[in-house]
A protein has these predicted regions:
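Symmetry-related core transmembrane helices of the 12-TM Major Facilitator Superfamily/SLC fold
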Residues: 163-180
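Hydrophobic core of transmembrane alpha-helices in multi-pass small-molecule transporters
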Residues: 19, 88-89, 98-116, 122, ...
Length: 350
């Protein structure tokens, strides 16, 4: 009992890190294009600069994951990546043109794109298959995301985009502080065990291959929604306020799912949850494409986010925990990011 209570206390810093990291993402990703536009950059250059994040997701997470498996220093690597990202963000204050911004974003995204995979790997032993506990950690990320989406939107509406670099530095500063709050755990003798646990045999397992294939297509479909839903709804005549409301619906149901998943997730096997998430995604895309002009259908489509993202994400983490234990954990989490949010994300927005 005392050990369980201690583990719950150790998860509090991970919840704080999830909140601050997604608070950073919640303002940075939506408003980066608007800041670049205010700088006077052409749309083609803006498109190239915003694609840097997807590019880094193809290589950076696996490099960081392999290094964390080799050293066992997942928390220290999180602190290092957060510190470098914060220092890199200071370059956004200097007006060096598009090439300079591209370089700054490359360094910044190289060190932030792997943070969640490293975090998931670091806290895996604390969750220990308790997916209700995992959900209560993860919901803080969703809450942080929604908070800064609206707070930053209101701020930029009233003050313009000139404070974008300051928001970047403040939120990354919060991320760095939370990494220093994490329990400083290290997996002992990492180097000796890492060389004995190659990842290739795991990747040859049919279940693992099918898992990553389904992940790729599932995330690719969702990135089409993430990238173009606002433009699509705007073309259908929805107001800006209603577009924001529909986005908020998806985040609210995500938070609700993570809060309640301890009572729900055990009703099906994790592989069955993957099937449910895939079927819900098909329905969500069909409603969005076929009935986009009907507001009720769009509310239903956005509410399906609880299944197409939240439950699917938990099932994915459970599958990774099962197939990539111990010294394989960092690389497994990294492959999840690379295949899903790197390759799948890039192709999803093309």
């Amino acid at each position: 009992m005392a050990n369980a209570a201690a583990q719950r206390r150790q998860l509090v810093p991970f919840a704080a890190l999830s909140a601050t990291y997604f608070a950073h993402i919640g303002f940075f990703n939506p408003y980066l294009p608007l800041w670049l536009k205010e700088l006077g950059l052409p749309i083609v250059v803006i498109s190239l600069l915003t694609s840097v994040q997807s590019f880094t997701r193809v290589f950076a997470p696996y490099a960081w994951g392999a290094l964390s498996d080799h050293t066992g220093e997942r928390v220290r690597l999180l602190r290092l990546s957060a510190a470098i990202a914060l220092v890199a963000s200071l370059g956004l204050w200097w007006d060096g043109g598009a090439w300079w911004i591209g370089l700054v974003l490359l360094v910044l995204f190289t060190h932030t794109s792997s943070m969640m995979s490293l975090t998931e790997a670091a806290m895996a032993h604390l969750v220990a298959g308790d997916w209700g506990r995992y959900g209560r950690v993860r919901l803080w990320g969703s809450a942080g995301f929604m908070l800064t989406v609206f707070a930053a939107g209101a701020w930029f509406e009233g003050h313009g985009m000139r404070d974008f670099p300051a928001w970047t530095a403040v939120t990354l500063g919060g991320v760095l502080l939370c990494t220093w709050w994490l329990p400083d755990v290290r997996e002992k003798h990492a180097h000796e065990r890492a060389v004995k646990e190659p990842i290739a045999p795991v990747l040859r397992e049919p279940a693992v291959r099918w898992f990553f294939a389904s992940l790729f297509f599932h995330v690719m479909a969702h990135f089409a929604i993430y990238g173009f839903l606002s433009l699509y709804l705007d073309a259908l005549g929805y107001s800006k306020a209603m577009i924001g409301t529909l986005w908020a619906v998806s985040v609210l149901v995500e938070i609700a799912w993570f809060f309640a998943q301890g009572r729900l997730i055990g009703r099906l096997r994790m592989t069955q949850w993957l099937v449910v998430g895939g079927a819900a995604a098909v329905l969500r895309m069909a409603l969005t494409a076929g009935l986009g002009g009907w507001l009720a259908a769009m509310f239903i489509a956005q509410a399906l986010h609880a299944l197409t993202f939240a439950s699917h994400h938990t099932a994915c983490i459970a599958m990774l925990t099962q197939h990539f234990p111990g010294r394989l954990r960092g690389r497994g989490q990294a492959l999840f990011t690379v295949i899903g949010y790197g390759l799948g994300g890039v192709l999803g927005v093309l």
